[in-house]
């Protein structure tokens, strides 16, 4: 028997067959993961490892407030996103380039031997900006920034932008209007009336033509044509006068011989091709366009209504014109003053072609 007693066997307890190690839950693993990363971001280096130049810094200069721009969706208080990856504030200096950042960053007063540390310090601060709370680590609002430095940064930011003219208080609409008016006065000598321009741009529909101005135009066509009128206006008036000769002869017969002599067309002058369907703004906007030509071909102008006549006087009917061999005999290319004959309706065609009426049986859903 050994006098030292039984020898302890410490490794027998670890070799138990029924021992199962408990696995950590997800909450415990996440907590351990966050706790392992948070001290690395927040803890300060030990005092023994600090540079003596940093210890000798001015405490007032080291506590200078940072310039922070708070925009929509960004906070300045201590609020970190999921797993510390969400940035909630943005420094003004980060919007500028590195040269502007180094020129406008206040240099801390240090010794000459510590100048390399002072140069490297802004780089270290810029690296840890996303992990540090701007304006102090307390939960209160950040300190007020320095106004002169903020003004310099805004000026530098203004020079960086593409459109620096947007910052001064200028009335861009008024300047554009003055430029347009100055150009019009330099090219044409006057500013056109906006009401006349807008009236000429509005093209009336062929179905909704006003009847009273048409009658007034026919009545005014029998009057004298001023000499200073445009050439196309004279042609339109002469054509309307020619139409007035066969429509109301007793009205135009009372004109003077001098006026009748002014209505005579020169032998080498022809009527414009688009006089019947040309836009009312043709005289003001130059020669007719291709759109006016298509409109004159495919849109049939409605004839003006006959003027009121006494019961015993009837205007002479125009003679039927022989069809031209160059144009096909279609209603779209009919140049006669009479409107084309209306086409029969679809219901009439159906009733003539089908012996029974259109009737549908009741619809069954199933």
Curated annotation (Swiss-Prot):
<protein>
    <recommendedName>
        <fullName>Proline-rich protein 19</fullName>
    </recommendedName>
</protein>
<feature type="compositionally biased region" description="Pro residues">
    <location>
        <begin position="302"/>
        <end position="326"/>
    </location>
</feature>
<feature type="region of interest" description="Disordered">
    <location>
        <begin position="1"/>
        <end position="53"/>
    </location>
</feature>
<keyword id="KW-0539">Nucleus</keyword>
<keyword id="KW-0469">Meiosis</keyword>
<comment type="subunit">
    <text>Interacts with CNTD1.</text>
</comment>
<feature type="compositionally biased region" description="Low complexity">
    <location>
        <begin position="275"/>
        <end position="286"/>
    </location>
</feature>
<dbReference type="Pfam" id="PF15455">
    <property type="entry name" value="Pro-rich_19"/>
</dbReference>
<feature type="region of interest" description="Disordered">
    <location>
        <begin position="301"/>
        <end position="338"/>
    </location>
</feature>
<feature type="region of interest" description="Disordered">
    <location>
        <begin position="102"/>
        <end position="149"/>
    </location>
</feature>
<feature type="compositionally biased region" description="Basic residues">
    <location>
        <begin position="18"/>
        <end position="29"/>
    </location>
</feature>
<dbReference type="GO" id="GO:0051321">
    <property type="term" value="P:meiotic cell cycle"/>
</dbReference>
<dbReference type="InterPro" id="IPR029355">
    <property type="entry name" value="Pro-rich_19"/>
</dbReference>
<comment type="function">
    <text>Promotes meiotic crossing over formation through its interaction with CNTD1 by participating in the crossover differentiation step of crossover-specific recombination intermediates.</text>
</comment>
<feature type="region of interest" description="Disordered">
    <location>
        <begin position="256"/>
        <end position="286"/>
    </location>
</feature>
<feature type="compositionally biased region" description="Polar residues">
    <location>
        <begin position="104"/>
        <end position="113"/>
    </location>
</feature>
<dbReference type="GO" id="GO:0005634">
    <property type="term" value="C:nucleus"/>
</dbReference>
<keyword id="KW-0158">Chromosome</keyword>
<dbReference type="GO" id="GO:0005694">
    <property type="term" value="C:chromosome"/>
</dbReference>
<feature type="compositionally biased region" description="Polar residues">
    <location>
        <begin position="256"/>
        <end position="265"/>
    </location>
</feature>
